[in-house]
């Protein structure tokens, strides 16, 4: 009997000990979650895309340049500009990698934005090799994939300005840049605007470039920040530190070349090694505001939308 009693007591003590440990673990988990939520709320949050203009941010994050600048930056990945817009409109991010047409439209709708950084964002208008389209005037009655209210919408109009086609050109909204590329590779679209590195992938598959955005001599890529979310002394300090880390990432990219960071391109742009090796040389610039003439051209396009 005594032996059974001892066993029961030992079992009860063991259960009590396990219960206490479970409570301690739960308490620590809640405390850790609370700390992380607080850190996340205090961090500078940026909406990014799987495109080459975001690479300085990925370099700064993965190579701890933000940490060296003593700023906590969280990069929130999206596949479409529209989703980035939703994030910055809702205030879940402080900044967004975008283009001037989109951001000027957001400003027209009442959102206050500032542009401390111009990015090397460029697109290429690429036609499906099976469509045998070699010139812009052959796009009549064809579908061109782009994003409405964006730089690619603007560039489509610019490219076709003064061009006589046999019929109307259909601008088709495909927001997700990875889906857009997939549609080209599967021969589901006649033509489309693609940024890097997606444009390089398309070229490797022998699809034809009929016009690059560089022809317009405009730089539309920007990193935009919500002015009203950066009013406190701490947020302003964070932005300054962010720019410092960004510039350091740019220096590293220009010194060592994009090939040195091929792993980051693979990781964040969801591409392949063959594409990474074939990407043309890109020069990244320190943080500078966009040219006023480029802002005005984007503004002038807005009333058409």
Enumerate the language-model features and the residues they cover:
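Pocket-lining segment of extracytoplasmic ligand-binding domains
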Residues: 100-101, 171-265
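Proline/Glycine/Serine-rich low-complexity intrinsically disordered segments
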Residues: 130-137, 161-162, 167-170, 181, ...
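Extracytoplasmic/secreted proteins, especially bacterial periplasmic and envelope-associated proteins
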Residues: 61, 83, 87, 92, ...
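An extracytoplasmic/periplasmic, membrane-proximal ligand-sensing/linker region
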Residues: 25-32, 36-44, 52-55, 191, ...
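Bacterial signal peptide processing site
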Residues: 18-21
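Short, glycine-/small- and polar/acidic-enriched structural segments
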Residues: 24-166, 171-172, 190-196, 208-212, ...
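Sec-dependent bacterial lipoprotein signal peptides
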Residues: 1-16
């Amino acid at each position: 009997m005594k032996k059974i009693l001892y066993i029961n007591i030992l079992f009860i003590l063991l259960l009590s000990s396990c219960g206490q440990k479970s409570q301690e673990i739960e308490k620590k988990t809640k405390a850790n979650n609370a700390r992380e939520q607080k850190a996340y709320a205090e961090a500078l949050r940026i909406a990014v895309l799987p495109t080459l203009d975001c690479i300085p941010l990925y370099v700064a994050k993965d190579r701890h340049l933000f940490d060296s600048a003593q700023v906590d930056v969280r990069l929130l990945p999206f596949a479409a500009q529209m989703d980035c817009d939703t994030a910055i409109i809702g205030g879940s991010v402080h900044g967004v990698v975008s283009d001037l047409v989109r951001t000027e439209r957001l400003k027209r709708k009442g959102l206050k934005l500032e542009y401390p950084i111009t990015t090397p964002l460029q697109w290429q208008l690429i036609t499906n090799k099976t469509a045998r389209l070699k010139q812009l005037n052959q796009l009549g009655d064809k579908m061109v994939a782009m994003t409405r209210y964006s730089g690619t919408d603007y560039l489509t109009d610019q490219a076709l300005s003064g061009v006589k086609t046999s019929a109307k050109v259909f601008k088709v909204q495909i927001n997700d840049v990875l889906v857009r590329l997939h549609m080209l590779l599967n021969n589901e679209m006649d033509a489309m605007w693609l940024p890097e590195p997606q444009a390089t992938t398309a070229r490797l598959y022998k699809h034809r470039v009929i016009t690059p955005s560089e022809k317009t001599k405009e730089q539309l890529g920007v990193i935009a920040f919500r002015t009203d979310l950066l009013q406190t002394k701490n947020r302003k300090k964070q932005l300054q530190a962010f720019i410092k880390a960004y510039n350091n990432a740019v220096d590293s990219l220009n010194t060592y070349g994009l090939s040195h960071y091929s792993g980051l391109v693979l990781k964040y742009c969801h591409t392949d090694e063959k594409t990474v090796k074939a990407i043309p040389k890109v020069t990244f610039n320190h943080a500078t505001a966009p040219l006023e003439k480029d802002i005005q051209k984007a503004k002038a396009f807005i009333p058409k939308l």
